[in-house]
Design a protein with these regions (language model features):
Chain A
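A compositional/biophysical signature of low hydrophobicity enriched in polar/charged and small residues
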Residues: 1-79
Length: 79, 438
């Protein structure tokens, strides 16, 4: 199961948050954004329970994250 | 700009080593069947790459207890469905690229080389680049910007000059280039295009991604096993294919190659001891692939990705082959024409680099879609230029488009002339990607 999480961050924390997100093994992609959100992370897990565990035990503890928005990927199309 | 110089040199060395292949094998064709050469090169290389992969896993596990690589998982993942290649299992994907990509493209390359000359065969490499460009345009993956058009024009001019000079050389040597040689060259370009398009359509399973995140060197044994399986399965499939050709009611050049191949199987170990075969195995297969995989794993985030540099530097192979064929084996190619072709091909490299650097606007577009139209809309949007991937989501938004375009003009066109004309899109949010961090 794949999910994307978009983050809104506080001021001057982007580098620190990105480093902490990169250190989580289940997160396979991290990118900085310009727009409503500051960072996007893509996570790969086995179950929704695992997603909850990683979110509550690792991601939610990162200082500097103001808000997050999670979407589960149902299907992917590629050229 | 920060260059990954250390690993760029890996790509350059690999291409230089490949460029010696036609020079090394050209004289071998009169003594040994093309099929025997291919069989030995890929079968032995496959075994060696496999052994290296397993050894690397053991060495890693011995030195690095915390970041162990599981051999069992490495093999179990072969059953994983490749979502980027028609959802077939990984091992079937490896068989396909092994036989139709690697083995057949080298087979047609050698046949063309046997029937024509080394410079003439370089046309095949240049045609492959043009075919891939048209394929990418056809599927709306890339657009023909000014750089791309110019590099196709440069390649076309180079092809014309090489053809003209090769025909002249054939006339002087009284050894005409046969039509069959050109047909083999076209077949080489087609199979080679298939190889380049499909070889990167590999997908990682969930467990593999986790393993890569824990230990990035997991990718090396995985890639080596992929190539080993592709090589070995390719040459194994070559045997029934050869038998089939041998029993065809009509005789062709390929039939003679097949008969010679079966006759030579008795002397296989003697042939294996020849320096040309050893060069092909060690210096044209094992070392280049190791260099490439090492570069790929250690690639640092820079302006361009590994794949982009790989396609830019791929032109080193035909350039150096052309130079070495003139300098080492005295192929006919007047100096002034050689300089012109080299200049054209170097300009092509620069144009290709410019195209890749310019092609740099990345964005994620989030869409809310009207109920009941998700699937049809996704397939429709995927056809638009710039849309590389689409994820269907559960959450606030229904779709996320992964977009990469050449310019803001193209981006504006996608948003305002394409997406905003779709009634089923209720809301649209753009997020530009600043930097890919992982």
């Amino acid at each position: 199961m794949r999910a994307i999480i978009m983050f809104k961050l506080g001021i001057n924390v982007i580098k620190k948050v990105i480093e902490e997100l990169k250190a989580i093994p289940e997160i396979k992609k991290v990118m900085s954004l310009t727009g409503d959100y500051d960072v996007l992370a893509e996570i790969e897990v086995e179950t929704s329970e695992e997603l909850f565990d990683i979110f509550s035990e690792k991601i939610d503890l990162i200082d500097g994250i103001i808000a997050s928005n999670t979407h589960v990927i149902m299907k992917a199309w590629e050229k | 700009m920060k260059l990954p110089s250390k690993y760029l040199s890996n790509l350059i060395i690999a291409n230089l080593l490949w460029s010696f292949i036609p020079i090394v094998v050209k004289n071998l064709f009169s003594e040994i069947s093309i099929l025997t050469i291919i069989f030995l090169r890929f079968f032995i290389s496959g075994i060696i790459l496999f052994v290296i992969a397993i050894s690397l896993v053991f060495v890693n596990n011995y030195l690095n207890h915390e970041k162990r690589i599981s051999l069992k998982e490495l093999f179990l993942n072969l059953r994983h469905k490749n979502r980027r290649f028609y959802k077939i299992r990984q091992y079937n994907y490896y068989f396909l690229i092994g036989f139709f990509g690697i083995i057949l493209h080298i087979f047609f390359y050698f046949l063309a080389l046997k029937k024509t000359s080394i410079p003439f065969v370089m046309i095949g490499m240049l045609m492959t680049i043009i075919f891939i460009s048209f394929y990418e345009k056809g599927v709306n993956y890339e657009k023909f910007d000014i750089f791309r058009i110019l590099f196709i024009v440069m390649l076309s001019f180079s092809i014309l000059i090489i053809t003209f000079v090769s025909l002249q050389g054939a006339e002087i040597k009284n050894d005409p280039i046969e039509l069959l040689g050109f047909i083999f060259l076209v077949l080489y370009s087609i199979t080679s295009s298939f190889l380049y398009i499909s070889i990167d359509r590999d997908s990682f399973s969930k467990k593999e991604l986790l393993n890569i995140n824990i230990n990035k060197y997991y990718k090396i044994p995985r890639a080596l096993i992929k190539m080993a399986i592709a090589f070995i399965s390719g040459v194994i499939l070559l045997i029934p294919a050869s038998i089939l050709i041998a029993f065809l009611p009509f005789e062709t050049d390929i039939t003679q190659e097949v008969i010679a191949f079966f006759n030579e199987l008795r002397f296989i170990f003697v042939i294996l001891g020849r320096w040309e075969i050893i060069y092909l195995i060690i210096f044209a297969t094992i070392i280049p692939y190791l260099l490439i995989f090492l570069a790929r794993v250690n690639w640092e985030p820079t302006n361009l990705t590994y794949s982009q540099w790989s396609s830019i530097l791929g032109l080193i192979d035909p350039i150096s082959t052309l130079i070495f064929s003139v300098l080492i084996v005295n192929e006919f190619f007047p100096f002034e024409y050689l300089i012109i072709v080299i200049v054209f091909l170097v300009i092509t490299i620069v144009l290709r680099y410019a195209h890749e650097v310019k092609n740099s606007i990345r964005a994620k577009i989030l869409l809310k879609i009207k109920r009941g139209s998700l699937k049809l809309i996704s397939i429709k949007i995927l056809k638009f230029y710039g849309v590389r991937e689409i994820d269907s989501l559960i959450g606030e938004y229904d779709l996320m488009l992964h977009v990469k375009v050449n310019s803001f003009k193209d981006f504006h066109y996608l948003i305002n002339r394409k997406l905003k004309f779709i009634d089923e899109i209720l809301d649209l949010k753009v997020q530009f990607v600043d930097k890919i961090e992982k």
